[in-house]
Amino acid sequence: MQDIAPTSLLHELVAPLGFNAGQEHDIFHCMENNQSGKVFHASHWTLLRDREVLIFQKKDVADVVPQVHIEEKWLDDSFVIPRQKEIACIDADKVKGPLTIRRWNQGDKFVPLGMSGKKKVSDYMTDRKFTLFQKERQWVVCSGEDIVWLVNERSDHRYRVTENTRRVLLLSIKVKDGE
């Protein structure tokens, strides 16, 4: 079997997605020099060189905001706190006003469950090795100005269920269009 040149393989991969020859050269150069974090754009696709891999993401036509599903429960002896990161369990009496959902912003801080001090959301995502695409798609659920849940990741410690909690809110996300 004949060896395939890496540049030919890259061309077969990216050309059908709309990346041009100059971009192919830059992508290959980025791979050869082990440059992470580089982003390349075609008309309908974005390519990210992240650590040792190439990640492709189709550009969204519209940014669909997911719905927050809220279930309220009274805390009793039969209640078991869910351990899935897809469900946040928070103290309902600590919530101020309506819950809102939005994308995270630079400078956002929260207190990750189990920690005592505030942490920037950007630092949390870097520590967890989020890709640029994952960071761009990250949602937060807020009570007023406070982040109560970094969606599908971690709740805020200030809203945790304690021995004094009477009512809990179980939060989950209903996502459409593969977001």
Q: Predicted segment positions?
A:
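AMP-forming adenylation/ATP pyrophosphatase catalytic core
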Residues: 1-179
